């Protein structure tokens, strides 16, 4: 499990990427993309407070803290670089959209934006795996690998979790109308087999002129199918960085 923010801040670098994970997620989710960041770019792979620790650490955090963390991390990169791209997953995409509306952001690379949520049986199965089960297929293995909280079998330690999810639903409602205000290049990817984010979420980008929306037919919320979908994501990530670099 990753327990701290990973940074590469290069003196004199003109471009940077900010990576923001989702609720109960981890910076490890961006492992397929970090090697694609050009060597002359800076990056910050942010660890949100309450992640990388135990169940009670997560309870002690809040949406307001995570939002402010993202803003501060972006401001740090913005102060030192001409170009900043935000790459985000799930809840992190909500903060990315908010930041792009209020601040100069050169590009967004968004994975599974939760504008509309549903809970499929696989989500419950993954929750059990994260509690202490043994993953036996790539979907379960991906869910456990992306999980950003230490396993804890004491159910009392989870008592503070419901407020965090109520806050998440509030953040979704708050962000949904902001999407159509986006005026920056944006690549948004949605998994057709996502167990948490409804594909209805993709419709929110229909009126965003600079948004390119792509559906991933074989992937889920944390699992990205390796033969077709993941290479497509990596190609899109490279293209976004190249597009933003050319704008300089």
Regions found by a protein language model. Name each.
Residues 38-55:
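Conserved alpha/beta-hydrolase
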Residues 161-179:
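Active-site nucleophile elbow and catalytic-triad environment of alpha/beta-hydrolase enzymes
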């Amino acid at each position: 499990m990753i327990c701290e923010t990973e940074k590469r801040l290069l003196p004199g670098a003109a471009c940077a990427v900010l990576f923001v994970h989702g609720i109960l997620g981890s910076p490890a989710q961006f492992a397929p993309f970090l090697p694609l960041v050009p060597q002359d770019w800076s990056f910050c792979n942010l660890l949100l407070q309450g992640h990388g620790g135990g169940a009670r650490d997560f309870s002690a955090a809040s949406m307001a803290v995570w939002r402010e963390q993202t803003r501060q991390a972006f401001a740090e990169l913005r102060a030192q670089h001409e170009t900043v791209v935000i790459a985000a997953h799930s809840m992190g995409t909500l903060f990315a959209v908010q930041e792009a509306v209020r601040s100069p952001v050169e590009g967004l690379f968004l994975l599974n934006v939760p504008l509309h949520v549903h809970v499929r049986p696989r989500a419950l199965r993954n929750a059990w795996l994260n509690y202490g089960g043994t993953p036996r297929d790539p979907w379960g293995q991906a869910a456990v690998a992306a999980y950003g909280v230490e396993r804890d079998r004491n159910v009392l330690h989870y008592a503070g979790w419901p407020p965090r999810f109520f806050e998440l639903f509030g953040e979704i409602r708050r962000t949904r109308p902001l999407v159509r205000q986006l005026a920056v290049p944006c690549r948004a990817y949605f998994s057709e087999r996502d167990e948490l984010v409804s594909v209805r979420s993709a419709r929110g980008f229909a009126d965003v002129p600079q948004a390119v929306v792509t559906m991933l037919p074989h992937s889920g919320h944390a699992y990205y199918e390796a033969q077709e979908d993941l290479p497509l994501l990596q190609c899109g990530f490279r293209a976004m960085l190249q597009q933003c670099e050319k704008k300089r």
